[in-house]
């Protein structure tokens, strides 16, 4: 996968040299290319922003540098057509399903906005040549798109073949399609079996794989109900077995996933 990142702070992305993502880059599994937006500015101060039309606080990123940057980066016709990602708090919520979908793309470009955002005409113009998506990592505002881009790139990259040492871990992640769809992962434990008087649940030491799978499913349901009841309401009732319904009833939820009346 090729990933181009356009930003006024290329150094923000040094974490992509670390851990499994850095190893994947060095082995050629991921081709990450950083671009300083100011390279496409020509005044003495390398200006990338200006005052907003219509008035109001803050500054807006100018369209000219963005247009030239995207033109030059996408000029490599042999690389195919990229998908442009605009991280913004006004975008669609980024989910694990989006990570799975985007991990199948051969080429992604991330445009990291700053200030009040990027002139809206940039996305309109780019959409004439490539798919464009606005994505949000949460209902809060950051100083720019760099942090969101790091989040999305890591979520996508870890799904690529060869990046993780154990591919089974992906299927057991929170929100993973299949048995973990719309569920968060339950508690995890490692050695020693007793630490400061706290014991690992005996079932995990039993070697009974079917029982362990059932325990993990139960704990995922309990933790999701406690921390993310909104996800429980999204569960397909047809996907719930008898034990699932019993667990939901234990934590105060009916089979229909609606809260039980007091």
Swiss-Prot record:
GO terms for biological process: tRNA N1-guanine methylation. Pfam families: tRNA_m1G_MT (PF01746). GO terms for molecular function: tRNA (guanine(37)-N1)-methyltransferase activity. One of its GO terms (cellular component) is cytosol. The keyword S-adenosyl-L-methionine applies. Disulfide bonds: none annotated. Gene3D superfamilies: 3.40.1280.10, tRNA(m1g37)methyltransferase, domain 2. S-adenosyl-L-methionine binds at residues 113, 137-142. Its EC number is 2.1.1.228. It is found in: Cytoplasm. Keywords: Cytoplasm, Methyltransferase, S-adenosyl-L-methionine, Transferase, tRNA processing. It is an enzyme of class 2 (transferase). It catalyses: guanosine(37) in tRNA + S-adenosyl-L-methionine = N(1)-methylguanosine(37) in tRNA + S-adenosyl-L-homocysteine + H(+). It comes from the Bacteria. Homodimer. Specifically methylates guanosine-37 in various tRNAs. NCBIfam families: PRK00026.1, trmD. Belongs to the RNA methyltransferase TrmD family. This is tRNA (guanine-N(1)-)-methyltransferase. It comes from Thermobifida fusca (strain YX).
